[in-house]
Regions:
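Primarily recognizes the serine-hydrolase "nucleophile elbow" in alpha/beta-hydrolase
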Residues: 1-35, 39
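Solvent-exposed loop/turn segments at secondary-structure junctions
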Residues: 14-17, 56-60, 90-94
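Active-site-proximal flexible loops/turns
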Residues: 19, 45, 96-100
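Short beta-strand/loop motif that positions the catalytic acidic residue
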Residues: 46, 51-55, 60
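C-terminal catalytic histidine-bearing segment of alpha/beta-hydrolase fold enzymes
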Residues: 53, 65, 69-116
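Short amphipathic alpha-helix initiation/capping segments at coil-to-helix junctions
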Residues: 32, 61-64
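Surface-exposed acidic, glycine-flexible loop patches that form ligand/cofactor-binding
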Residues: 1-2, 40-44, 112-116
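Short, proline-enriched alpha-helix->beta-strand connector loops that line the catalytic pocket
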Residues: 3-6, 44-50, 78-82
């Protein structure tokens, strides 16, 4: 159940239809598609808080930063109250997680519920 998720933190997430699904459909890697399997298809105002992290737009895979930026923009357009986007300058798809961990940690600290 998607409503049970406490927070979303995609690291360089592919938010259009995944490249493997597109390959199975006979599409090329640079042919963008959005269907029901794509996270972009499911953007809504009332989902969990989301921290979107991408590497440098010039170093990421196949326009991944632009996907992340569009994902973020759609959350803002539907009125989502807690969506954040970070672009990590100088980091590519392979090394961006290292720079993302402090952001992840801070996001969790800010959003976790205190259990007594």
């Amino acid at each position: 159940d998607a409503d049970m998720i406490a927070g979303l933190i995609p690291f360089s997430g592919q938010v259009i239809t995944h490249f493997e699904t597109r390959r199975q459909m006979g599409l090329q890697p640079l042919q963008p598609t959005i269907d029901k399997t794509a996270p972009l298809f499911h953007v809504r105002k009332d989902c969990a808080p989301i921290l979107i992290i991408s590497g440098d737009r010039e170093k990421e895979l196949y326009g991944r930063y632009e996907e992340a930026a569009y994902f973020y923009r759609l959350f803002k357009l539907v009125g989502h109250p807690d969506a954040t986007l970070y672009e990590l300058d100088g980091y590519d798809h392979g090394n961006m997680p290292i720079a993302s961990y402090p952001l992840l940690h801070q996001f969790i600290k800010e959003h976790e519920k205190v259990k007594k």
